[in-house]
């Protein structure tokens, strides 16, 4: 998409999956202060790992929130739904005009490799891309004691690039920042998603009423030692920037499946 017209202040929508009161989105808003007109629309509660879920059987409500950045208060709404709900509601109902850019984050914890599919943070940015908007997701690769300042600095830099140059239609950026000081970060790397999976199981437990319940547990397994992957970049101290898209067609597989005996006019038993 094209960047905002010269002289126009860009409209930037912020979202996340950690919830509107999470420190990551507050740090993001503060870091982007002054780059344009900021709006925050985010879930009222934590929505980690909800993926691209949307609410279809319950009402979705929005209420105004107090949200401050160094220059003063900015418009903000808490939404009783998922990250994707929040972006949909913002663009269709809450904002008086579409944003020029949607930024989701800063997530507490990485969103690399297969975890992109589970991530509510990435899904908020993906929903924006589906709506035809430029978007990016940004995550800090630290769970326990996150320090968002450096990630915010990189968010600002990459947002400036995105506003200046625009993104290809249907493509968003998935950004992961290593948990290092500004001086320790080696730079930025354009990467691809690493192939990975989870070795999972469920822990069977019993509640006080002696009823069983199950708790998901697992170990992350990296199946890809390529130096150009997001996991490799983070390990080497680089900010990882991965272009991704919601078109999940396996275009490279068309040649392989072209050898199958396709007959568009045949029935399931092969008859005409």
UniProtKB/Swiss-Prot annotation:
Enzyme Commission number, as recorded: 3.1.3.5
GO cellular component terms attached to this protein's record: cytoplasm
Record-listed a divalent metal cation binding positions: 17-18, 48, 107
Cofactor note: Binds 1 divalent metal cation per subunit.
Cellular compartments annotated: Cytoplasm
Main location: cytoplasm
Record flagged with keyword Cytoplasm: yes
Domain of life: Bacteria
Molecular function terms from GO: 3'-nucleotidase activity; 5'-nucleotidase activity; exopolyphosphatase activity; metal ion binding; nucleotide binding
Record's catalysed reaction(s): a ribonucleoside 5'-phosphate + H2O = a ribonucleoside + phosphate
Pfam families associated with the record: SurE (PF01975)
Nucleus recorded as keyword: no
Cofactors, names only: a divalent metal cation
This protein's UniProt keywords: Cytoplasm, Hydrolase, Metal-binding, Nucleotide-binding
NCBIfam families tied to this protein: PRK00346.1-4 (NF001490), PRK00346.2-2 (NF001492), surE (TIGR00087)
Chain's role: Nucleotidase that shows phosphatase activity on nucleoside 5'-monophosphates.
Family indicated by similarity: Belongs to the SurE nucleotidase family.
Name of this protein: 5'-nucleotidase SurE
